[in-house]
Regions:
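Conserved hydrolase catalytic core segment
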Residues: 19-62
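Glycine-rich phosphate-binding loop signature in dinucleotide/nucleotide-binding domains
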Residues: 20-23, 203, 207
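Core-facing hydrophobic residues within beta-strands of well-ordered domains
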Residues: 47-49, 173-176, 184
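Conserved serine/cysteine hydrolase catalytic core
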Residues: 111-171, 177-180
Length: 212
């Protein structure tokens, strides 16, 4: 039904949590996943044990968001080859080395019956219908209500969440912890998964110790 409004994303998250029977889940969300978690928790509809927000906060940069949209809007009718896909990714993420072996791209795309390569996401999600100013205000309000352990992870090269945007969130949520991953852009885990994973595991072991 192509319902990708922020509120529908929250409803989807609540449904997933309910389906697995998690009483107090640990939420780790990057970009849209992080903002969805923030809205769900900050509005009191989901009680989580801890939350990790990856390169997202209420104050993000429009230019960075526009770059993501431009990347997603490329080749709406599909890519002709894996090389063309790799070129698009390399243009969007110049900090990464373009892979010589393109077999790994197969998990990020699908080969359609038309012989073209398409992203896994629904192309209809590009048709944003909600008001971004109102959306960001709702994130601001949600951030004021956080009382659970929170870790904010920022990619040091990110043009979506700047250092100023991160510090603004930390002022709103002073008990939150913060990690700046140098050498990583918006796709933090993809750029520096070693540092990212280590920071998340360390945080969770401290704030939500494993049972037994």
């Amino acid at each position: 039904d192509a319902a990708y409004e922020p509120e529908m994303n929250v409803q989807d998250l609540l449904a997933v949590v309910d389906s697995i029977g998690a009483q107090q889940p640990i939420l780790v969300g990057a970009s849209m996943g992080g903002s969805t978690s923030l809205l769900a928790v900050g509005t009191g509809r989901l009680h989580a044990a801890a939350m990790v927000m990856v390169d997202i906060a209420p104050r993000i940069e429009p230019e960075g968001s526009d770059r993501i949209k431009a990347f997603m809007d490329q080749k709406p009718d599909g890519f002709d080859s894996l090389d063309e896909v790799a070129d698009a990714i390399a243009s969007y993420q110049p900090q990464r080395t373009r892979p010589r072996n393109l077999d790994g791209l197969a998990k990020n795309i699908r080969l359609g019956s038309d012989g073209k390569y398409h992203w896994h996401w629904d192309p209809r999600r590009r048709n944003r219908t909600w008001d971004m100013s109102e959306y960001r205000q709702s994130l601001e309000r949600a951030a004021d209500n956080l009382n659970l352990p929170v870790l904010l992870v920022r990619g040091g090269l990110s043009d979506v969440l700047t250092e100023e945007g991160a510090q603004s969130f930390l002022q709103q949520c002073p008990h939150a912890e913060y990690v700046n991953v140098t050498g990583a852009a918006h796709m933090v885990a993809g750029d520096r998964n070693d540092v990212f994973s280590g920071a998340v595991v360390d945080f969770l072991h401290r704030v939500v110790p494993p049972e037994g």
